[in-house]
């Protein structure tokens, strides 16, 4: 999802959060209790929707069951966002949803959640939980602790769009990132719902997926920590661009880490035959995520060029996203 930018819910450094890059716009505060209630409601509504779809048999494909569920859960969050006039209530959803959905998908596969797990299923679920825990450990959302005292500045800008705010909030601030992350997760979903009894054991493709996902998490971890420390320096507050650590080789290494994580889901889909059977579904989401973040790099560069005097030199010398040797 990180990470993140293009999506109004992904911040300047690739994370959905309420980072103070700019002075927070005055908005209606949201109590922590409201944030907890929003996510409890979202979870209950999602679980009931999943159960109802399974019971009715109206949708048989687990992938599309999950898609409907995550969209319905997102709408539940959106209702709280509109009721509280603050769309930042949605901010952590895109990281919370995939690990929980992963367990739900395993429960629908052969053997259920408490039955036998294949090495592949363990790997996919473990990678998602490591990814999610890393994010929530480094970016403790204020909504859980003290509530929200402001709304993300991107949402503030989108309020000026020539469309009704409620519609812009629903489609652009809530459903768009939900759908993007869900389809990026598609290869992992197809690997999870495959019956372990009929699939090959953990192999080279799975090892590649694990290696890629863990490398991605490490890149995000180090780049975010390096940026956090830099934000505490006088250089940052004086408008100097970050050019240390991984940021020496990429203007947005955390974006690269997020893209790499979702691309790393693709190898898990290969041994179960999903890539051969449903290539568009396996590839479209991760590729769309890569395109999304690449365009996000451009948007953030435009903003940095207006705010940081030396940033044009960074653009000229440092790779936009993929780490590479600087030109000088």
Tell what function each PLM region has:
Residues 86-100, 148-172, 240-247, 320:
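Juxtamembrane helix-capping/reentrant segments at transmembrane boundaries
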Residues 75-84, 94, 102:
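Conserved donor-binding loop and adjoining core beta-sheet/short helix segment
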Residues 81-88, 114:
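Membrane-interface helix caps and helix-loop-helix hairpins in membrane proteins
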Residues 23-74, 98-141, 176-226, 231-328:
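Hydrophobic transmembrane alpha-helices
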Residues 9-28:
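Short, Lys/Arg-rich, polar N-terminal cytosolic tail immediately upstream
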Residues 135-155:
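Active-site neighborhood of divalent metal-dependent phosphoester bond hydrolases
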């Amino acid at each position: 999802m990180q990470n993140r930018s293009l999506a109004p819910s992904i911040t300047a450094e690739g994370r959905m959060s309420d980072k103070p890059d700019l002075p927070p716009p005055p908005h209606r505060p949201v109590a922590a209790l409201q944030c907890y209630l929003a996510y409890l409601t979202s979870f209950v509504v999602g679980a009931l929707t999943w159960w109802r779809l399974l019971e009715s048999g109206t949708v048989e494909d687990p992938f599309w069951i999950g898609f409907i569920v995550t969209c319905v859960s997102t709408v539940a969050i959106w209702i709280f966002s509109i009721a509280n006039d603050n769309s930042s209530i949605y901010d952590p959803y895109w990281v919370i949803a995939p690990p929980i959905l992963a367990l739900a998908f395993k429960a629908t596969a052969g053997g259920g959640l408490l039955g036998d797990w294949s090495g592949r299923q363990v790997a996919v679920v473990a990678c998602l939980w490591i990814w999610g825990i890393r994010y929530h450990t480094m970016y403790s959302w204020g909504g859980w602790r003290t509530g929200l005292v402001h709304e993300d500045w991107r949402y503030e800008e989108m309020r000026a769009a020539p469309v009704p705010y409620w519609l812009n909030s629903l489609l652009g601030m809530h459903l768009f990132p939900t759908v993007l992350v869900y389809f990026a997760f598609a290869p992992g979903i197809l690997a999870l719902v495959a019956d372990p009894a009929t699939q090959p054991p953990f192999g080279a493709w799975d090892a590649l997926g694990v290696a890629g996902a863990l490398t991605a998490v490490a890149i995000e971890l180090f780049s975010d920590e390096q940026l956090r420390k830099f934000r505490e320096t006088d250089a940052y507050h004086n408008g100097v661009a970050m050019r240390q650590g991984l940021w020496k080789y990429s203007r947005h290494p955390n974006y690269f880490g997020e893209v790499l994580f979702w691309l790393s889901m693709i190898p898990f889909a290969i041994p179960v035959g999903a890539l051969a059977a449903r290539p568009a579904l396996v590839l479209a989401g991760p590729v769309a995520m890569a395109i999304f973040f690449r365009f996000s790099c451009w948007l953030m560069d435009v903003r940095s060029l207006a705010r940081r005097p030396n940033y044009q030199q960074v653009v000229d010398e440092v790779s936009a996203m993929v780490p590479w040797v600087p030109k000088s």
